[in-house]
Amino acid sequence: MHEEGGSLGAIDPGDLIMVMSNDRKDVITYVEATNEADENFGYESHGWPGDVIIYRKNGGSDTPVIHRAVLEVVANGSGWDVPGTSLVNVQEITLTLDYDCYNFHDGNYKLNLQSWEPEHAGFLTSGDNNNGGCMIDQPSANSYGEGIGLHDSMGNPVLPVKDDWVVGVASSEIPWVGSIKLLTT
């Protein structure tokens, strides 16, 4: 924690992040790590439940994004499964996560998906973007007007993160070391 308003485990500007290949590690999502019935219950990375992944927006050549994997949608026949939840073979996803939005509505709000119909299988992610991290990066999954989400360099909304768009999983961090690069660019 070296930035005002930062928190333990948070990735701050200037931190050097070690990246583990996603081929070496299965991504554990926030919903899996917070579900008491899931084998990954209690797992944390960078101060919060679930893994932080590095991905390319829509598989493009934009600067990669480093955000937490909130949940994964998996194709199942004609519907969708959400590992770490009771949602199996559903057509749309409605889910309120135990994910406090401290900087949104005075902290009296939970991250919410309302009747979301996935475009394809992949991860939904969230980071320290607008609304204090209480916005899904993928605009189609945001409900109640939390925000516009992320867009790629062509202006297209970011879609659920496919496995082959994932560059890696954030491993350990070394505070301040990356500041040298920030100062020289």
Protein language model features and the residues they cover:
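Short amphipathic alpha-helical surface micro-motifs
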Residues: 36, 47-50, 103-108, 141-153
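Extended, hydrophilic extramembrane loops/domains of integral membrane proteins
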Residues: 112-184
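Feature for secretory/organellar precursors and membrane-associated catalytic proteins
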Residues: 1-103
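Low-complexity, serine/threonine/proline-enriched polar segments
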Residues: 93-124
